[in-house]
Amino acid sequence: MRRQIFTEEHDAFRDMVRAFIAKEITPYHEQWERDGIVSRDVWLAAGRAGLLGIHLDEKYGGGGQPDYRFYVVLNEELARAGATGPMFQLHNDMIGPYLDRLCSPGQRERWFPGYCSGELISAIAMTEPGAGSDLQGIRATAVRKKGGGEVGGDRYVLNGQKTFISNGQLADIVIVVARTDPDAGHRGISLLMVERDMPGFTRGRNLDKLGMHAQDTSELFFTDVEVPAANLLGEEGGGFVALMQNLPRERVTIGVTALAIAEQAFADTLAYSKQRSAFGQPVGKFQHNRFTLAEMATEIAVAREFTDRAITEHCAGQLSNDEAAMVKWWDTELCNRVTDRCVQLHGGYGYMREYAVGRAWTDSRVQSIFGGTTEIMKEIIGRGLGL
């Protein structure tokens, strides 16, 4: 079935993204996987190509294009190429909306140009060793101080530890979720922008993950970091609400990526099943394998229609948190099932990282964990049903 949600402009953009990936990412990705981190050069190249901050004002170097579908195209093509190293998805879809919604004019002047050019790589620090899905369990603290101090004015003294932070080694600016009022529950959570060279901000090791080896993921430590009050994003105490407002987009974006991974793994496996022979015939001709491929094709087609509808609803500002949770749950779990079946259909070759399906299997497993686990998605959906 032909997709109905894109225009010729989106199609042209897709061609450009594919060319960018072929030139700037694919030739280097294996080395990045060995290094455990990408080169900053790819971020600068993405900035020059107009792939960062597509929705932000052109005067800051953005694309001036608020259409979310351009990000859908970018994320789909990165997923299909197995380009897990450059975390443009995080930069554009998870951090960009916070900046666009919360930054003051002065903050825009300070951060937006570098954000769009790739000179300022961004991260967001929510998860702590003792607080994952339960954001109200955040223990990092930011205590407001008046005058004096190293920054010479009103500031927050930030203390705490974060973990599993994507872009953690490379990040120049980090949105830190911290508790500014210990007695106010979720109304005591605020967002602070921590910059690379602030004293007391240190990074732990680059974590050794099961997959996504080219993506730097780190622990971050904050010890009496003096963050200027001018680096508060939005209002003090407004952090939790801001986080909740962006979750539907984050979850649809993860679903978009997961479904694209599943589609590519299926396409690779279908081609392999037609050319790989056993017992005198292509392995896809065996009834069990044929049925397995038929099931995957159907499940992916159904998910594609559902996800494209959610993209359309999001673009119209009509996608609910419950519906976004459905997309995230369904697409990520489908991706897990599809990549696992595809590895099985490849036999021993599927277990080799030199085969794309093997990398997809390990790289994509986290999709049903980050951004809210499958179990949390079901909780959200259940509550939406009045249960």
What do the PLM-derived regions correspond to, one by one?
Residues G118-M126:
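A short, Trp-centered hydrophobic/proline-enriched beta-strand micro-motif
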Residues M1-G85, L102-Q107, G114-E119, L135, ...:
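Alpha-helical interface subdomain recognition
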Residues G137, D197-P228:
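Flexible, small-/acidic-enriched active-site or ligand-binding loops
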Residues M94-L102:
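Helix-loop "lid/cap" segments that line or gate small-molecule binding pockets
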Residues Q65-P66, D134-Q136, N167-A171, G185-G188, ...:
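Short glycine/proline-enriched turns and hinge-like loops at secondary-structure junctions
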Residues D154-R155, N159-R203:
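A short core secondary-structure module
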Residues F88, Y115, G130-S133, F164-N167, ...:
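Short Gly/Pro-enriched turn/cap motifs at secondary-structure boundaries
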Residues A140-V143, G149:
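A structural signal for short hydrophobic beta-strand segments in well-ordered beta-sheet cores
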